[in-house]
């Protein structure tokens, strides 16, 4: 979905369309009814349109005209953000930002990476050769495996103390939703490392990308990443 200033909430969630033949209204699903939704340049759309994602990202459902409809399972939203044109973008609502598990800054490719990109684009567009790498069943199985990874009481307390530190040292710290996201991300990392349990290294590796975007600081040069780094330096596993 290309997010633009004139995009409406119904353009995302769907709307009721009148069927002249049957003289009834039929619901036409919006693009949010998919397993993976890519919101391109999400901050170019006004907050009212962005709010259409809140219920979907939290409850895997959307409500239109008083009717609630479930979304496909699995359901995931991936968004890109335009940071180049600040005068033509909107600030993302805190409630929306908090629903994203991670924020990853890609930056520019280095020389070798850019040369490789140019080589891949010299012929046919890579999208023409895209092949599935996993089925829906594979994703559900992976999600179940990650959910079974053990996060001990010590690890959970470590995550909680990191979150509390951010709340005490920022205008707006990490929410309980952020703590839960950090535990889940740490479980996923442990699974990728071939372990059935989380270790502090998992938490420390995931914390910057999971917590930083949720934190708001006072003006003065520091940002969420600085607060997270400070928390990791000061808080020890007990």
Positions of predicted regions on the chain:
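Non-catalytic accessory segments flanking P-loop/AAA+ NTPase cores
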Residues: 1-3, 11, 58, 111-113, ...
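AAA+/P-loop NTPase substrate/partner-engagement loops
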Residues: 1-21
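Residue-level signature of catalytic and energy-coupling elements of molecular machines
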Residues: 12, 53, 100, 159, ...
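Conserved alpha-helical scaffold flanking the Walker A/P-loop in AAA+ ATPase domains
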Residues: 18-38
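Canonical AAA+ ATPase core
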Residues: 19-24, 44-49, 57-133, 140-149, ...
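Walker B catalytic acidic pair
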Residues: 40-41, 52
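Conserved AAA+ ATPase small/helical "lid" subdomain
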Residues: 129-179
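C-terminal engagement/docking regions of AAA+ P-loop ATPases
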Residues: 168-238
């Amino acid at each position: 979905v290309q997010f633009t200033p004139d995009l409406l909430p119904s353009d995302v969630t769907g709307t009721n369309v009148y069927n002249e033949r049957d003289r009834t209204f039929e619901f036409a699903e919006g693009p949010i009814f998919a397993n993976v939704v890519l919101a391109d340049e999400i901050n170019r759309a006004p907050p009212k349109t962005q709010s259409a994602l809140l219920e979907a990202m939290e409850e895997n459902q959307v409500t239109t005209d008083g009717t609630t409809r479930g979304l496909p399972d699995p359901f995931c939203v991936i968004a890109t953000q335009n940071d180049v044109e600040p005068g033509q973008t909107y600030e993302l609502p805190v409630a929306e930002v908090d629903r994203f598990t991670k924020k990853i800054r890609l930056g520019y490719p280095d020389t070798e990476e850019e040369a490789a990109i140019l080589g891949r684009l010299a012929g046919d567009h890579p999208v023409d050769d895209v092949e599935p790498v996993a089925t829906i069943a594979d994703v559900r199985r992976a999600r179940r495996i990650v959910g079974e990874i053990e996060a001990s009481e010590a690890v959970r307390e470590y995550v909680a103390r990191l979150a509390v530190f951010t709340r005490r040292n920022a205008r707006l710290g990490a929410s309980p939703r952020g703590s839960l996201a950090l535990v889940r991300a740490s479980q996923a990392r442990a699974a990728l490392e071939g372990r059935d349990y989380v270790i502090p290294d998992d938490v420390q590796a995931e914390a910057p990308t999971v917590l930083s975007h949720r934190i708001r600081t006072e003006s003065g040069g520091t940002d969420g990443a600085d607060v997270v780094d400070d928390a990791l330096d000061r808080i020890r596993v007990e």
